[in-house]
């Protein structure tokens, strides 16, 4: 298939592009490089074993989107492009709604003009809000996300659901993922956050490699086994595989298809720190800090629907997530070259 991957040079997008190329698909990457670097592109090609086409541009440029969809005879779109820092979204709500909601509107309007009807959306477990029951199941009603980031994901899900009702021949997958971590096992591709990392694993990795002094663990008084927050961590390679499987199985299958992509188990912040200490062979310096507003004590996925319907399940452990992250970070202490 000929696949347009928006945000394809970012963390999850780049790993997914490698898996798509390895599966023989033709990949066109669209990215404005606001959160990624051009130097990842040759790595994608080398690991994928095939050349991807790259277009530098913005999903909010509807004319450019229409041109790409037409000129490359795109069959399906996997949509990763968007801003993703929860804390930043509270400070910059308009930028998040413009990029994530308006950007997606421009993209699907271009798809309609180009008669492309297969769409995979990179959604998030944040759309569930605060649920009374764990694990989270796709049949749960969506909640009220705490941040503009989460709200933007939920708004896009609602827009896509309305679109599919009005245009019943569209196939739309809403992939709700939990906490992606890890890196390509080669050690040559991984998460390379710009500035201070917003997520746990890259922050731990930067402490271990000497770029940061200490990890702040927000809250050690939660009603969990060790008092720290519990989340569902999924290896980015398992997540990438989930996108490829969803794309291949759901192409031209009309409907809105909703799947949780998670490991189906919860691990605490201290579990992750301990796994990383084991991977890098030394203790990771950390300290406790007050809880962050809006953080939930614990949640994880019920991913049995994806197992049942897509024959997809995670195969990589927390130890492998830590080992692969350390392999990447220790080989590339400063991330990708500028």
Swiss-Prot record:
Disulfide pattern: none
Residues where NAD(+) binds: 11-12, 31-36, 58-59, 80-84, 99, 124, 149, 153, 178
Regulation: induction: By D-galactose and D-fucose.
CC cofactor: NAD(+)
Outcome after substituting residue 153 to M: Decreases the catalytic activity. Not reduced by sugars in the presence or absence of UMP. It contains very little NADH
Pathway in which this enzyme or protein is active: Carbohydrate metabolism; galactose metabolism
Protein name: UDP-glucose 4-epimerase
Gene designation: galE
């Amino acid at each position: 298939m000929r696949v347009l991957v928006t945000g394809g040079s970012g963390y999850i997008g780049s790993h997914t592009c490698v898996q798509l190329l390895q599966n023989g698909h033709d990949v066109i990457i669209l990215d404005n490089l606001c959160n990624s670097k051009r130097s990842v592109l040759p790595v994608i090609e080398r690991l994928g074993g095939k050349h991807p086409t790259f277009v530098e541009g913005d999903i909010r440029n509807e004319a450019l989107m229409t041109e790409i969809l037409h000129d490359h005879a795109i069959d399906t779109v996997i949509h990763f492009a968007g801003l993703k820092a929860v804390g930043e979204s509270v400070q910059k709500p308009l930028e998040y709604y413009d990029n994530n909601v308006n950007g997606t509107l421009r993209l699907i309007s271009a798809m309609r003009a180009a008669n492309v009807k297969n769409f995979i959306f990179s959604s998030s477990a944040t759309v569930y809000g605060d649920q009374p029951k764990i694990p989270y199941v796709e049949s749960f009603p969506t909640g009220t996300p705490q941040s503009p980031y989460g709200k933007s994901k939920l708004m896009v899900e609602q827009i896509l659901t309305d679109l599919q009702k009005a245009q019943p021949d569209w196939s739309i997958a809403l992939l709700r993922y939990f906490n992606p971590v890890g890196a390509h096992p080669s050690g040559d591709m991984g998460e390379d956050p710009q500035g201070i990392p917003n997520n746990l694993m890259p922050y731990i990795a930067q402490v271990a490699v000497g770029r940061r002094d200490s990890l702040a663990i927000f809250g050690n008084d939660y009603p969990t086994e060790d008092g720290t927050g519990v989340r569902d961590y999924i290896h980015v390679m398992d997540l990438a595989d989930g996108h490829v499987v969803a794309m291949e199985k759901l192409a031209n299958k009309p409907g809105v298809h909703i799947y949780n992509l998670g490991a189906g188990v919860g691990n605490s912040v201290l579990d992750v720190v301990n796994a990383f200490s084991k991977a890098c062979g030394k203790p990771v310096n950390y300290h406790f800090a007050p809880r962050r507003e809006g953080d939930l004590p614990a949640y994880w996925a019920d991913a049995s629907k994806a197992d049942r319907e897509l024959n997809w399940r995670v195969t990589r452990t927390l130890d492998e997530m830590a080992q692969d992250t350390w392999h990447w970070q220790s080989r590339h202490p400063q991330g990708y070259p500028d």
